[in-house]
Amino acid sequence: MVQEIKIRCKNNKKTLQLPIGSTLWDAYHALNLQMPYGPVSAKVNNKVEGLHYRFYNDKDVEFLDVTSSSGMRTYTRSLFFVLVKAVKDLFPGCVLRIETPVSRGYYCDLRIGRPIEEDDVTAIWRRMREIVDADIPFHRIQSPTEDAIEMFRRQGMTSKVRLLESYGAIYTHYYQLDQTVDYFYGSLLTSTGGLKVFDVMKYYDAVSYTHLTLPTNRE
């Protein structure tokens, strides 16, 4: 007999029974909720979790969409990962740093060994759209931290190495999108298909670098 757990949903005030090990995504579909802008994450006993989260005992759940600040952060992190994959696919060996927020987006420093042209920006947008349209899963992977550190070190991701070394945790969760891996503090969507709204454009600052701005809530 399959063991079941009880989920109490704050969105519609309903309670349901699910097999132990079910995910938040499973619960959302079982509840038949209608969220035009989500869900992108959920509060589980008031702690924000990604939709990959699995239940092993009774929980209170509130699903979140992009109209909440927490939901928008989940959307933005997921979009960042798509951007990372797109520029790596197009410009192997490039350096991308996501910097400070700007109006309705983020200021990104992309170094590809030459000035960025409008055609480059268009190519990035198109590659991101291809990744979104393919609805590729974001896989959440747990591994010993020392293994994750070594993997990021082999890929030259020194900032991730320093970050994980500073935590001192025994195990680490990181994400994989197709063949691209990265570490994010916080949840992502379950797949790229939920990232319907985004844009990429050139952005010039006071020095001679050319950058990108990544709007995350474009009308």
List PLM regions with ranges:
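Ubiquitin-like/PB1-type beta-grasp interaction modules and other compact soluble beta-rich domains
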Residues: 1-80, 84-85, 91-102, 126-127
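Residue-identity detector for glutamine
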Residues: 3, 17, 34, 142, ...
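Non-catalytic surface loops within mature trypsin-like serine protease
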Residues: 11, 112-114, 216
